[in-house]
Amino acid sequence: MNETGDLFAWGEVQPKTEFSWESYQWCDGSKDGLTKYNEADGKRQLETEDDAAHVILGGKWRMPTPKEYRELLNNCIQTSYLTYKGTEGITFTSKINGNTLFFPMRPETTFTGATSMTGNCWTSSLDGNTGGYNDPYFPIVLQRGIAMDIRNMDPLNLIHLERYEAAFIRPVLPE
């Protein structure tokens, strides 16, 4: 049984399988028609009711911030690619306490037709570094090309995705 997990668009709390501007909850069908988290409302951080981790798990669970993912980047090392309970993924081990995190990955076909494994995970806020509200949002990205030599690769980084695109959520529970 494969338990990769559900995929979400940014700011949506229901998982889905089709991702496009036309199906994105917070626009009128195009990138230029954002209806929430835009210049008019000035919001850059997900509200609780739009945080899938909080809505699904309740309590203090939430999606992580870009700062928290940067801490992960700085304080963990990639330890292995593996299959855990039928799900392919990647593990990272803390340089501080030795704890290990598993991130699921899924196959994805690129625009060139190549297949890679990807494990994009959303953060809870807009990329405040690039200006406008039409900019994509910071997810954490785990990616492995099928023919790529992974021994010298740093697969964990922050990039932009369009907010309608598919990504996992990796909930955090603040102390």
State what each model feature region is.
Residues M1-Y24, D28-D51, V55-R62, P66-E175:
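C-terminal, surface-exposed recognition/capping segments
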